[in-house]
Curated annotation (Swiss-Prot):
GO process annotations (BP): mismatch repair
Key word Cell wall biogenesis/degradation present: no
Annotated binding of ATP, by residue: G626, P627, N628, M629, A630, G631, K632, S633
Organism, scientific name: Cereibacter sphaeroides (strain ATCC 17025 / ATH 2.4.3) (Rhodobacter sphaeroides)
Stretches the record annotates as Disordered: 829-856
GO molecular function: ATP binding; ATP-dependent DNA damage sensor activity; damaged DNA binding; mismatched DNA binding
The protein, known as: DNA mismatch repair protein MutS
Length: 876
């Protein structure tokens, strides 16, 4: 065969690959998925597996690599996480069937699934405690919408979304994949933060989208689901079209779409989410985030619901009150709370099991998960008293009424079923008499094998003779090579038929063994076919009740979250916040939940602080001054997080909290260069500040830290001053504004809504002690040089800094020509003095001398008390 001749198998591969140019093709060949050409080179590098070759094409070697079927999911996960899409081409017939069409016929193969980041369903490919959203963005003239779905759970929603709101919405949902029309300019692609998939404009056609959705949900009109705009229909239709493409016609079990109205949740932009570390720490992981600090859920659906609540705090007062009332009730019911959590720990992920059943990717364990979840649902409903708050009482209907399905699954399934249908053995004995009889025949045949082996040993006199089985030879008789000559010679050779010789072993069969093997295989195959038939029937029975099962799963997640919030409140001594439609913001003894948790590990107590921005009908701004390291940023963040937690339906880390409904949370705390877009730290800071000033309404909560620090002093002061005035006069919102520009404290006397606050420090023998206490008033200095010394700057640098600082401060105290002369005579351009000699240790104070002379074990209680008074008298 010449190099240019394409084999039938390779011709089939190239044809399938041409239909999926943007994906790596997993091409099934027996027990392996093989990859060829460029796919092989890409996959071998990404998966760190060997790259080989197989034949030639157009004179060039064909690159090849492969992964075993049994380990394919792990390799798939690696490829998906590295940004690849994978098309899976399976063998659609047995090789024996292909040979009936001719000796050169190729096994028929088809792509059964296109695996992408937003279309995962297998547990091994998903994060159990996080959603896996697929989003679609559609624009029609001046309107736009965003639809999203998690096909692993069935959640399906849509919301109006003008382009300026797209990035904040994507930050809220954190999708794995975004679908856009292929003609859409992608100038914002680097900000999306997920895989971006362009689709043909036809996928976004709103007219065909409506028909597509009606077909999916089996309805004649979508009116019962909501009054959707054309962009909303377009976005939902594109999403469903993409699912049809990737799942090859096996659409997931999506719930009817929920239309989220604009303004239903607190608006939080991407920068604020990042700064507040709501679901992800600045280091990139979950640890160190608010989510990590407050997560006490015991089920995967409960954990996913918690993430959604923290990402989307509610603005619905009635809903907030219902959630808080349920949490409050469970804090007062410790025994019930622990019983509920004990039952919830036994609840599997029913949502994802149900989704796999709908997509025909499930195994017996998914059915067992449905059985276990519904069993616990009944148990939890039975524990819930009649006087439970409305939110918990509403779950009872969803948790009850599953007895018939649970009984069916109990009768049909063994207690611990295998993972895969092909493994068999998952249908319980006694469920089907025919299956039981077939299994008996199969198992008796295996018993006969043992008897036959004993007979062969007696006949041959070879004690090491064994009857074994593999997938190639079936059942065979094996002896070591030392006995080969005996077995191959008369009279044994007349009944023992030689099959195979390997290194060290020789294998034989007999007519009787072959006949027995046929009977065993027939019984085994029939038993497996009967089990597959029952699996299909059970799958249908489960999917017939998919709606009720989904409602039970969501009810269990709600109970889990309420119980988790209650457990958190009791364990951490959190308080129920008062949330109303006032403009109040009064926090007494508030704490930062993440920082407090971190300090507890070191045995360090957290210093709680008050915050009051409760000026009625007027803006309320605290202008906070104080040194670095004193805790200003922590104070700012903790108050934003307290507001967020309250509107998410949680108790809060404070002694008391009264929060008037917050519509938006904005945070400009910390900054870094955006090198990819050529933006400096100062530019990033200004862009984020501009977004706040342009968008914050009078119910927003804004926290700003060190505005203007990235430029020249007077420029920075001017920008910070004007920003604070704009917040006060135009936005008229509640705000915490931290600054090092002490000149700004004068605004407290000029703007009625501005008050000064400072973080206290104490100086002791030249040392700075940070008290982390916020009090009314202004700081008198910044202590920057002292902080630099604590950071470990060389003593010569610290001394030089003090010299410059003294000159600058004396210049500020002068005026007119004298001040200018001092500025001109600054020591900035003089030669620096030589490094000072190491300072002698300071002379011990009288208190220290007395303490060193004490032998505590020799003191009586009376002497110790007297000594304490003496030491107090020695203090200056």
């Amino acid at each position: 065969m010449s190099d240019d001749t394409v084999t039938p198998m390779m011709a089939q591969y190239l044809e399938i690959k041409a239909q999926h140019p943007g994906a790596i093709l997993f091409y099934r060949m027996g027990d392996f998925y093989e990859m060829f050409f460029e796919d092989a080179a890409l996959a071998a590098e990404a998966l760190d597996i060997a790259l080989t070759k197989r034949g030639k094409h157009k004179g060039e070697d064909i690159a090849m690599c492969g992964v075993p079927i049994h380990a394919a999911e792990g390799y798939l996960l690696t490829l998906i996480r590295k940004g690849f899409r994978v098309a899976i081409a399976e063998q659609m017939e047995d090789p024996a069937e292909a040979k009936k069409r001719g000796s050169k016929s190729v096994v028929r193969r088809e792509v059964v699934r296109l695996v992408t980041p937003g279309t995962l369903t297998e547990d091994s490919l998903l994060e159990a405690r996080r959603h896996n959203f697929l989003c679609a963005f559609a624009e029609i003239r001046d309107e736009a919408a965003l639809a999203w779905a998690d096909i692993s759970t069935g959640e399906f929603s849509v919301t109006p979304c003008p382009l300026p709101r797209l990035l904040p919405e994507l930050a809220r949902l954190a999708p794995r994949e975004l679908l856009v029309a292929d003609e859409r300019p992608l100038d914002w692609i680097e900000e999306v933060g997920c895989a971006l998939t362009p689709l043909a404009r036809a996928s976004f056609d709103s007219a065909s989208a409506e028909k597509r959705l009606c077909t999916l949900f089996g309805v004649g009109t979508l009116d019962s689901f909501g009054n959707f705009t054309r962009p909303e229909l377009s976005a939902m239709g594109a999403l469903v079209d993409y699912l049809d493409l990737t799942q090859r016609g096996k659409l997931p079990l999506l719930r009817p779409p929920v239309r989220e109205v604009a303004g239903g949740t607190v608006q939080i932009d991407a920068a604020t989410r990042r700064n507040l570390e709501i679901t992800q720490a600045l280091t990139g992981g979950r640890e160190g985030s608010l989510l990590s600090a407050v997560d006490r859920t015991v089920t995967a659906p409960g954990a996913r619901l918690l993430e959604r609540r923290l990402s989307s705090p509610s603005r619905d007062l009635g809903l907030i009150h219902d959630r808080l009332a349920a949490v409050s009730w469970l804090t007062d019911e410790p025994r019930l709370r622990e019983d509920l959590r004990a039952s919830l720990r036994r609840v599997p992920d029913m949502d994802r099991a149900l989704s796999r059943l709908a997509l025909d990717r499930a195994g017996p364990r998914d059915m067992a998960a449905i059985r276990a979840g519904l069993t616990q649902a009944e148990a939890i409903a039975g524990r819930m008293p009649a006087d439970a708050p409305s939110l918990l009482a509403e779950t009872l209907e969803a948790l009850r009424g599953h007895e018939n399905l649970v009984d069916l699954l109990d009768q049909a399934l063994v207690a611990e079923p295998p993972l895969l249908v092909r493994d068999g053995g998952f249908i319980a004995p006694g469920f089907d008499d025919d299956l039981d009889e077939t299994r008996r025949l199969r198992d008796e045949g295996r018993g006969v094998i043992a008897s036959m082996q004993a007979g062969f040993i007696e006949t041959t006199g070879i004690q090491s003779l064994k009857i074994k089985h593999n997938n190639v030879l079936g059942y065979f008789i094996e002896v070591t090579s030392t006995h080969a000559e005996k077995m191959l010679s008369p009279p044994l050779s007349e009944s023992f038929i030689h099959r195979q010789t390997t290194a060290g072993q020789v294998r034989f069969t007999t007519v009787a063994l072959s006949e027995l093997e046929t009977r065993i295989l027939n019984a085994g195959n029939r038993a497996l076919e009967l089990e597959k038939m029952h699996f299909a029937a059970l799958r249908t029975a489960i999917l017939d009740q998919a709606g009720a099962i989904g409602r039970a799963a969501r009810a269990l997640a709600e109970v889990d979250l309420i119980a988790a919030f209650a457990d958190l409140a009791v364990a951490e001594d959190w308080t129920e916040p008062q949330v109303d439609d006032s403009r109040a913001f009064a926090i007494e003894a508030g704490r930062h939940p993440v920082v407090e948790r971190a300090l507890r590990r070191t045995g360090t107590p957290f210093v709680a602080n008050d915050c009051d921005l409760s000026k009625a009908e007027t803006p309320a701004v605290w202008l906070i001054t104080g040194p670095n390291m004193a805790g200003k940023s922590t104070f700012l963040r903790q108050n934003a997080l307290i507001a967020l937690l309250a509107q998410a339906g949680s108790f809060v880390p404070a002694r008391r909290a009264h929060i008037g409904l917050v519509s938006q949370i904005f945070s400009r705390v910390g900054a870094s260069d955006d090198l990819a877009r050529g933006r400096s730290t100062f530019m990033v800071e200004m862009v984020e500040t501009a977004a706040i000033l342009n968008q914050a309404d009078d119910r927003a909560l804004v926290i700003l830290d060190e505005i203007g620090r990235g430029t020249a002093t007077w420029d920075g002061l001017s920008i910070a001053w004007a920003t604070l005035e704009h917040l006060h006069d135009t936005n008229r919102c509640r705000a915490l504004f931290a600054t090092h520009y002490h000149e700004m404290t004068a605004l407290a006397g000029k703007l009625t809504g501005v008050e000064n606050a400072t973080v206290s420090v104490k100086e002791w023998q030249g040392e700075v002690i940070f008290l982390h206490e916020v009090r009314r008033g202004a700081a008198d200095r910044s202590y920057g040089v002292q902080v630099a010394r604590l950071a470990g700057l060389p003593a010569s640098v610290i001394e030089r800094a003090r010299t410059v600082l003294d000159a600058l401060e004396s210049g500020e105290r002068e005026s007119g020509p004298r001040r200018q002369a001092l500025i001109d005579d600054l020591p900035l351009f003089r030669a620096a003095p030589p490094p000072p000699a190491p300072a002698a240790p300071p002379k011990a104070s009288q208190v220290e001398e007395r303490l060193r002379a004490i032998q505590p074990d020799d003191l009586s209680p009376r002497e110790a008390l007297k000594l304490l008074y003496d030491l107090r008298a020695l203090l200056p």
